[in-house]
Amino acid sequence: MKNLLKTALLLLVVLAMAVPASAAVDLSKIVVLGASVDSGFLDGCWVKHGQIDAWPAIFARQAGSDFQQPLLDEPGVGSSKGCMILKDLAPTFDYALSVPKPLNLTLARPYNNLAIPGYLAASATNCVTATAAPPCNNPLIDLVLRGSGATTLQQAASLKPTFVIIGVFGNEALGAATSGTVIDGVTLPPTAVYAASYKTIVDTMKAAQGGTGVGVVATIPDISTLAYFTAVSPIIGVNAGVPIYVLGSTGCASGVPVCSVPPGTLVPFPMATLMKTGYGIPCAVAPYPNCNKPLPDNGDAATGMPGLLYPSEVSLLKTRINDYNSQIQTLATADGYKVFDTSALIAGITSTGRDFGGMTITGKYLQGGFFSYDGVHPTQIGYAIVANDFINFVNANYGASVPQVDMSVYLFGGNSTGYPLGLPVNQGDVLNYGAAYWTPETLKTWPGLFGVDLRHLPLPEGVEEGPVVPERRGVEVQ
C-alpha cells in the first residue's frame, strides 16, 4: 500500500510538472513599461478618456486585475500645440490648452501603467525626473514618477509583477520620422545603443519576477503604415498619364532649387497646411500664393512643422526598425518573454482592415476609424482592437482565458462619446447607432456577433428607407 501511495504521489508530481507553466499564469499584478501608444495617448493628447482605453488598461480590465494609472482630467496634456479638436472636415483642428490635472496623484505605490508619452528605452532606464537633456527632457516624467527618485524601470520592478507588458518602445525611430530629420547616429540611435537599454529593461524585469520572465513584449510597427505618413499623397495630379509629384529641394539637378520629389517620398500630415497655401504645388497645377515653393526637407523645431521623408530616409528607418525588432525578439525570448507582433497587426489594419459585421475599420486617416486625429495613435476603437488581439495572444501562449472585449461598446460610441466603460450597452442604443450607418439587411446579420441579440428589437423609425444619421455625441462637426 505504501509503495502504491508513493507511486501515486510521484505520478501526481510528474503530471504537475508536465502541465505548462503558462496554464497557471497569474494576471493579478500587471505592470506596463512603454511609451505613448501604451499609455492611451490619442488625438495628440494624454487625457483620461484615452488613458482608460489604453490597450493594456483594457486587457487588465478584462483580466479582472487592479490596474492603477496616472490619470489626467480634461482637457489633458497635449503635444506642443495642445489636444486636437476636429473643427471641420477640411480637416481643420482647434487645439485645447494643455492643463495637467492629475487625478490619481496620491496613490501610495507606483502605477501599474508606467508608460509615458515620448519615452525612449533609455528613458526607462535612466530618468528619475525631467531634465533639459535627452533622454529625460520630458515634463510628463514628473507626473508619473512623482519625485520618487526611481526610474520607471525601478518602480516597475519594485511592484514584483506577476505579468509584465513591455510595450512599444519606438520613439527612437518615430521621433526622427515625425521630425522629418533622419540622421543616422544622431536623430536615429544605433541598434547597439537601443539594444543595450532594452536588455537592461528585460533583464531587470526578469530578475524582479524571480528569474523567469512572464509576460509579453511588443514590436515596433513600420512607420510608413501610420496615417500620419499616408494621409497626404505625394502625387497631386496626373498629366498625360504621368503622375505629378509635390515639390521639394533635395535631389534636384545642379542649379535647380526646386523639383518634383521622387516616388516613395512620404509627406507627413501637418504639411497639408502648407500645401493649402501652395507650398509643394506647381503653379501650373494651382496658382496659389506660395506655388512653386518647395516643401521643407527638414523639420522646424520652432514651428513644429516636420520635413519630407525621402526614399533613402524611409529605407533607413525601415532597416533600423527591423534591426530594433530583431533585438527585441532575441533579448525578450532569451529572458522568457513572449513577443507580440504589433508591426503585423498595424500592417494588417492598413492593408486589408478589420471587419465587424459589415463595418470595416481601416488605417485611412479620419475615414478608417483606427487612427486618431494625430495620425499616429489609435482611437478608442483602435485600442480595443489591439487589446483583443493581445488577449488572443496571451490566451494562446499562456493558457489563460481572458474574455474578449465587447467591440459594440467602442463601435457605437466608446467611453468618451456617451457610454461609461465597464457598463452593459443598452441594446436599443446599439441598434439605433447601427441604423445610422447600415441597412436593416446588414443589421439582421448581427445576432450573436457582438454577444447581443437584436432580433427582438423594433427597427428605429425611418430606417426602412435607408440609413439615418443621429446626433453624434461628443463630437461637434461644424
What is each of the regions a protein language model found here?
Residues 63-64, 159, 197-217, 320-341:
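A structural motif corresponding to the C-terminal end of an alpha-helix
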Residues 229-319, 326-378, 413, 424:
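Mobile gating loops/cap/lid regions near enzyme active sites that modulate substrate access
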Residues 8-18:
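Bacterial N-terminal signal peptides
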Residues 19-24:
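Sec/Tat signal peptide C-region and signal peptidase I cleavage site
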Residues 30, 54-59, 363-415:
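Histidine-centered active-site loop/cap adjacent to the catalytic His
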Residues 1-9:
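Bacterial N-terminal signal peptides that target proteins for export
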Residues 30-44:
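Catalytic nucleophile-elbow at a beta strand-turn-alpha helix junction centered on a G-D-S/GDSL motif
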Residues 45-200, 410-477:
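Conserved SGNH/GDSL esterase-like catalytic core that processes O-acyl groups on lipids
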